[in-house]
């Protein structure tokens, strides 16, 4: 059995979770959520509901990790509860579908924002080939950092996590500044929809899918529970 080095403290573990949650989703999903609900009050409601539901899942994972402090996350939990077959299916689904798609999404959104900056400077966007190369390079770079070990990658996560928190804080600050000055011209129904019916409820439900994607990543620390100094925390 492999003995893992416990190189991750509470700071690094928290940074890993923050970096996974504040990924591509939080920067990419607000626009489609706003397009679905159409007003700021329901926009905020979607994020609050998504956050509450996410907290329920995170608390369950925290309890399971404290009870079963083993690396592997959902694979380990399913193996303990339902046996190796179900856990095997979940593990391969994560490898071939969910985690792989998540990595691709993060790299593409990163490239999309770099492309936007490049277009502002040069006046022309990237082509398909440069987009592919930059996305691939991003994946290779982050993979290379992780190959140097948990200790180094944990330190990078602290830096990346702090940078993302600052970026999100800046976006929130700019938004609140715009509303405080009465600049709501970008919204057709700034605070409440003109009519509220089943179509509004369905729109909120559809928008929740995007918020769940944006909040995904809270299970990140469970994958490396045996490399955390005190996983019970």
Residue ranges and their predicted role:
Residues 18-21, 25, 52, 114, ...:
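Hydrophobic/aromatic residues within the transmembrane alpha-helices of Major Facilitator Superfamily
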Residues 3-4, 40, 44, 122-130, ...:
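Helix-loop-helix junctions that connect adjacent transmembrane segments
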Residues 14-21, 47-48, 52, 92, ...:
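Residue-level signature of the transmembrane alpha-helical core
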Residues 32-36, 47, 54-139, 143-147, ...:
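Hydrophobic transmembrane alpha-helices that form the core helical bundles
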Residues 12, 41-42, 86, 152, ...:
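Residue-level recognition of membrane-helix boundary sites in multi-pass small-molecule transporters
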Residues 1-31, 35-40, 54-62, 71:
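Membrane-interface "cap" regions at the ends of multi-pass membrane proteins
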């Amino acid at each position: 059995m492999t003995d893992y080095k416990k190189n991750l403290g509470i700071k690094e573990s928290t940074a890993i979770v923050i970096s996974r949650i504040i990924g591509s989703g939080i920067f990419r999903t607000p626009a489609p959520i706003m397009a679905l609900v159409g007003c700021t009050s329901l926009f905020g409601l979607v994020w609050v509901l998504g956050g509450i539901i996410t907290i329920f899942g995170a608390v369950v994972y925290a309890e399971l990790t404290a009870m079963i402090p083993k690396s592997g996350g959902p694979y380990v939990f399913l193996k303990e509860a339902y046996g190796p077959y179900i856990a095997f299916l979940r593990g391969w689904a994560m490898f071939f579908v969910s985690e792989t798609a998540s990595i691709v999404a993060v790299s593409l959104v990163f490239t999309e924002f770099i492309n936007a900056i490049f277009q502002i400077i040069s006046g022309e966007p990237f082509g398909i080939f440069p987009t592919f190369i930059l996305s691939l390079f991003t994946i290779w770079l982050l993979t290379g950092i992780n190959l140097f070990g948990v200790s180094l990658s944990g330190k990078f996560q602290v830096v990346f996590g702090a940078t993302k928190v600052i970026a999100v804080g800046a976006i929130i600050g700019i938004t609140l500044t715009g509303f405080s000055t009465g600049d709501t011209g970008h919204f057709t129904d700034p605070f409440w929809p003109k009519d509220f019916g089943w179509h509004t409820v369905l729109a909120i439900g559809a928008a929740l899918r995007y918020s769940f994607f944006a909040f995904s990543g809270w299970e990140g620390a469970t994958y490396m529970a045996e490399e955390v100094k005190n996983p019970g925390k």
